[in-house]
Each structure stands twice: as structure tokens, then as C-alpha cells.
Amino acid sequence: MEWTPAMEHNSLSACCTLSNGAAIPCVGYGTWQMPDGSGTADAVLAAIRAGYRHIDTAAAYGNERSVGNAIRASGLPREELFITSKLANPDHGYEATRAAFLRTLDSLGTDYLDLYLIHWPNPIAFRDQWKQANAGTWRAMEEFYREGRIRAIGVSNFCQRHLEALLESAQIAPMVNQLSLSPGLTQDELCRYSREMGMLLEAYSPLGTGRVLNVPEMAAYAEKYGRSAAQICLRWSLQMGFLPLPKSADPTRMAQNIQIFDFSLSDEDVAAIAALDCGGVPRDPDTTTF
């Protein structure tokens, strides 16, 4: 995605285009660490009512059923929402992926997903055979994509070595790589390679799990532009060409987090924010313990 200030200022209509031509709303609502239950359903419903049309969940979050309840409660036609979920680590491999995807559809109460991602490339259960497991998983995802049950397919937390291995057997290239991206944590080389391979970059934890908001420089930028520190971070993410996935259960902050289409940061400030020392370090997917 290449961001330009001339893009639509209406947060409800601002979309990016994936490599297959599918439109994806430029800001999503993240649901990591939101447990299954009425609280999560209420938060997702509030986000939809605030204007979000892109909801990001995962089987590993354990909240797909609550997300589905919120989608139905919203009363919006399914086609007006962009729903993403992700394959859980124990379910890699062709047959397991097919079964897991169908469970996700059932939990969400939908007959298709807009985007389905491999959540992690190297789960501990497949450490000695991750390449083969990912190849089988991807074959299953390609089949669902061709059947129209997934509108776009991609990956999350994949480094270049994982992408290269996947592309050796893939017939359809990933359209998205969802990564931990925030001020001071830009993963430049990985982002460059992902873009060269045609992938849009989604940013999870775009506020650095909150630590970025406490950096003194962010307060200065917030004052300069008359915005909250979170809005500065999210606008920065857009101008970096990332698609941010902020999370908040607070209705006021939910609304603020999508009010980022009516101002721009200077090129100098974008570069300076990217270079901030915010203490962020990407997790190595080859050493995860799950």
C-alpha cells in the first residue's frame, strides 16, 4: 500500500487494494487479549457502531464466537464488513487446516472470510518440519480461496526465510504479512521483501502495546498536531504504508483511533518517529514456545 494524503478522508470508505484486487479497509479493529464473552461482543459491536468495518480475530484468541455474535448484532449486511481470522499453531498441515478453517467459519457464523492468515510460521509442535507443515497448510488455504470461501490469504509473523520457503511450493503468493510494527519497530528489510513479493503489511500492536505512548517525543508530536499520541502513531502507520490494527474497549478511544484521515504528518516527522527508541523488539518466530 502506498499512502497519499489525497486518499479518501472518510474512515468508512478509505480502503487499500490487495494484490488480487480485493479492497481492505485501511484501519482494522484488533481483538488480541480480548476473552470470549459478552464483554468482547459488546466491544466489537461498539467498534462497528463507531465506524470500523474491518475486524481482526484469530482462533488462538479464543473469541471468534463473540466476534460473530457482535457481527450479527450489528445488523449490517455481511458484505459491508471485512473479517480476518488466523490459523492456530496446533492446526498446521493440510487436513488440520481444512478442519480448523471450517471451525472458524462456524464460530464466526459466516460462510466465508475476507482474509485468512497463518498466524505463526514455526510452531513448537512442528519445529522439525515447519516447511512441510506450512506447505500443506497453504495448499488447503489455496483451495478454499479458489472456492471463494476465503477472499484473500496471507501470513503473520513470517520472516523472509519463512516466506521464501513457502513460495517454493505456493501457487498463489500471500497477499498480506501481518507483523508487529510501531514507532521504532519498523522491520525495514522484512517489510521491503514482503512488498517486493506483493504483500500488504498489516501492523498489529501499532501502539507498541502502549509503551510508545509514554515516549516523551510522542507527547510533543501530539501537541504539535493537536491530536492524541495514539492518533499520531496510527497516522504514522498509515503514512509508512502499514495497515494498523488498534485495539481499545473504550468507546472514546475507539472513535479517536479512526479519526486519522483528516490530517497528515510531515515527511520529516514520519522519519523521526520511525527512528524513535521505544524499546520494541520483534519476537523471533523460530524460538516461540507455543
Where in the sequence are the language-model features?
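Short, acidic/polar
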Residues: P35-A47, G93-L108, R161-E164, L185-T186
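Active-site mouth loops of central-metabolism enzymes
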Residues: V27-S38, L87-Y94, A125-W130
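A short, structured active-site edge motif that brings together acidic residues
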Residues: R78-D91, L115-P121, L181
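CE4/NodB-like, metal-dependent polysaccharide N-deacetylase domain
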Residues: T97-I118, E143-E147
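Acidic (Asp/Glu)-rich catalytic clusters
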Residues: L18-S19, G68-R78, L105-T110, L167-A170, ...
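Residues at the N-termini of beta-strands
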Residues: H54, Y112-L115, A152, V176
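N-terminal binding-site loop/beta-alpha segment at the start of enzyme catalytic domains
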Residues: E2-L81, G136, A140, G208, ...
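Beta/alpha (TIM)-barrel catalytic core signal, keyed to glycine-rich beta->alpha loops juxtaposed to Asp/Glu
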Residues: D36, N122-F290
